[in-house]
């Protein structure tokens, strides 16, 4: 997961500080969420706003990357990012990052990252730039 995010940053010729929001894969599985939060913290530190959209749309299997990309781009255009639904309490084993929970958040970001992590290490991290 960490490697996928770092390679995406390298391909985009960006530093972690350039990213204003991360759309987490966030499947609400103990092992997956702990691993993803740790990898995200290692790349971005504790101040990166992050949420998962699966609580809004479910896990659409092969379609989740495309749907979450579209939703992330839409949220960026609106300068408002949705919270992770039903995230009332963060697992203490998850890393301390800026989870968007309870209510959405107004954010004006230039770059955002969408992550999808699958069984067997089939991982993608895509970076998008907000259109003018």
Model-identified regions with their sequence ranges:
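Conserved "HGTGT" condensation-loop signature of ketosynthase/thiolase-family condensing enzymes
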Residues: 1-132
């Amino acid at each position: 997961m960490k490697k996928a995010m770092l390679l995406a940053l390298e391909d985009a010729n960006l530093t972690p500080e350039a990213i204003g929001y991360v759309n987490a894969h966030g499947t609400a599985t103990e092992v997956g969420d702990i691993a993803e939060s740790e990898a995200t913290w290692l790349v971005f530190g504790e101040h990166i706003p992050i949420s998962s959209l699966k609580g809004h749309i479910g896990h659409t299997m092969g379609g989740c990357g495309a749907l979450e990309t579209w939703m992330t781009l839409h949220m960026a255009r609106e300068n408002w990012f949705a919270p992770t639904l039903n995230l009332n309490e963060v697992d203490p084993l998850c890393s301390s990052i800026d989870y968007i929970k309870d209510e959405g958040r107004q954010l004006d970001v230039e770059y955002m990252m969408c992550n999808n992590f699958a069984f067997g290490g089939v991982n993608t991290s895509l970076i998008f730039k907000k259109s003018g």
